[in-house]
């Protein structure tokens, strides 16, 4: 049953290695996304910013004055990438530690466009989904069969990374569980010692009280 669960988790990871969406933000708003990434894995972020036009009641391509500040932090909260890009672009980075990577985006707000409503189209691709195989085949002059073999090898490598990441998560969870159980045990022992000491003190106090009243 456990192996089936791990296999299902790996399939879901592969299926969700690429996602496309869009969201609305104001020009001073910050949006962050969490992506679980194995170590030594390439992540590519494609984005496009559109500006709301009240006259047409729709969104149009943003002006050159609007750009996006992109910041990426790894699972240790270290900054992997932080810079200002144009209103449309492609960003890539490689993870060096496994875990949750936080991708934050916000516009480089200016007084002219302050408070404007923006629509951001976002597409995040992880692992072998981030590889442009058409470009690889052209550069390396690969045949269709060679390209297919290359894709299969990359998929196997990505699955191996996902398995290693799942083991890493299991190890962290086990360590957290053991640490929690240990703390609960020591806390229970401490409570027991306190109760025993209080009981002993109460017995001594009652004995002294009865002796003072000459009841014993």
UniProtKB/Swiss-Prot annotation:
It is a single-pass type I membrane protein. Its main location: endoplasmic reticulum. One of its GO terms (biological process) is dorsal/ventral pattern formation. Residues 21-182 are lumenal. Disulfide bonds: none annotated. InterPro entries: Emp24-like, GOLD_dom. The chain crosses the membrane at residues 183-203. A motif (Prevents secretion from ER) lies at residues 213-216. Residues 1-20 form the signal peptide. Keywords: Coiled coil, Developmental protein, Endoplasmic reticulum, Membrane, Signal, Transmembrane, Transmembrane helix. GO terms for cellular component: endoplasmic reticulum membrane. Residues 204-216 are cytoplasmic. Residues 134-164 form a coiled coil. It is found in: Endoplasmic reticulum membrane. The keyword Transmembrane helix applies. Residues 30-126 form the GOLD domain. It holds the Pfam family EMP24_GP25L. Belongs to the EMP24/GP25L family. Eca and bai are essential, though not redundant, for dorsoventral patterning of the embryo. Specifically required during early embryogenesis for the activity of maternal tkv, while the zygotic tkv is not affected. Involved in Golgi organization. This is Transmembrane emp24 domain-containing protein eca. It comes from Drosophila simulans.
């Amino acid at each position: 049953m456990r192996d089936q669960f791990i296999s299902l988790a790996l399939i879901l990871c592969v299926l969700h290695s690429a996602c496309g969406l869009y969201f609305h933000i104001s020009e001073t708003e910050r949006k962050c996304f969490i992506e679980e990434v194995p170590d030594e894995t390439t992540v590519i972020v494609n984005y496009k910013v559109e500006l709301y036009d009240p006259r047409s009641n729709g969104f149009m391509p943003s002006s050159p004055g609007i750009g996006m500040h992109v910041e990426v932090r790894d699972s240790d909260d270290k900054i992997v990438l932080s810079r200002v890009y144009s209103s449309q672009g492609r960003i890539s980075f490689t993870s060096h530690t496994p875990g949750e990577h936080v991708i934050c985006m916000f516009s480089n707000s200016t007084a002219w466009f302050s408070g404007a409503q923006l629509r951001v189209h976002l597409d995040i691709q992880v692992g072998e989904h981030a590889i442009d195989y058409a470009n690889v085949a052209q550069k390396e002059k690969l045949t269709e069969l060679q390209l297919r073999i290359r894709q299969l090898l990359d998929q196997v490598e990505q699955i191996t990374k996902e398995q290693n990441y799942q083991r890493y998560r299991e190890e962290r969870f086990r360590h957290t569980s053991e640490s929690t159980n240990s703390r609960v045990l020591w806390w229970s022992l401490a409570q027991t010692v306190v109760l025993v000491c209080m009981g002993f003190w109460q017995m001594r106090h009652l004995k002294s009280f009865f002796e003072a009243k000459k009841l014993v």
